[in-house]
A protein has these predicted regions:
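Mature catalytic domains of secreted/periplasmic carbohydrate-active enzymes
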Residues: 21-163
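Bacterial Sec-dependent N-terminal signal peptides
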Residues: 1-23
Length: 163
């Protein structure tokens, strides 16, 4: 009588152990993302900040003809932006550092059409640096968008511009 439960347990154990054999992973049919692509997808939500001359000139698109002196975000607080992004669950920030109008939010030497020629911090401001520093402080990623299109460029709209 005691042999029945023992045989039953042995049978069940052998069935369970046979189910534990390694399963062959199927071959990938489509391209498999690289590890860095998977990490990018895990980032999920970013803030995309479009802030520049248009903000102060009531324009959706700039034509590269707005006076830089109209740009003066005297109460700008990049840390406040980043705190808000973090509280909203954002994993990073992308700043439009130069849009199609050609205006640069950092003091570049490559064009006069930049923050260096504004009243903001007496021409000493650098919003790219300020936002980057705030992102580091609060532990989120930072990136910039630079438009390759530059409507402020003198030869814009000519064949030379395209070359």
């Amino acid at each position: 009588m005691k042999k029945h439960p023992l045989i039953l347990c042995a049978g069940i154990t052998s069935l369970l152990l046979s189910a534990c054999n390694p399963v062959k992973v199927p071959e990938a049919i489509l391209p498999v993302p690289e590890a860095k692509q998977v990490e990018w997808q895990k980032m999920e939500t970013y803030a995309f900040v479009h802030f520049g001359l248009n903000t102060f000139n009531d324009r959706e698109w700039g034509y590269g003809d707005s006076d830089p002196k109209t740009f003066n975000p005297a109460k700008l607080d990049c840390e406040q932006w980043v705190k808000t992004f973090v509280e909203s669950g954002m994993k990073g920030v992308i700043l439009t550092a130069k849009h199609h109008d050609g205006f640069c939010l950092w003091p570049t030497q490559l064009t006069e059409y930049c923050i260096r020629n504004t009243p903001y911090k007496n021409g000493q401001g650098d919003i790219v640096r300020e936002l980057s520093d705030a992102c580091k402080k609060y532990g989120i990623k930072f990136a910039v968008y630079l438009s390759p299109w530059d409507r402020h460029q003198a030869n814009y709209g000519t064949p030379e511009y395209v070359d």
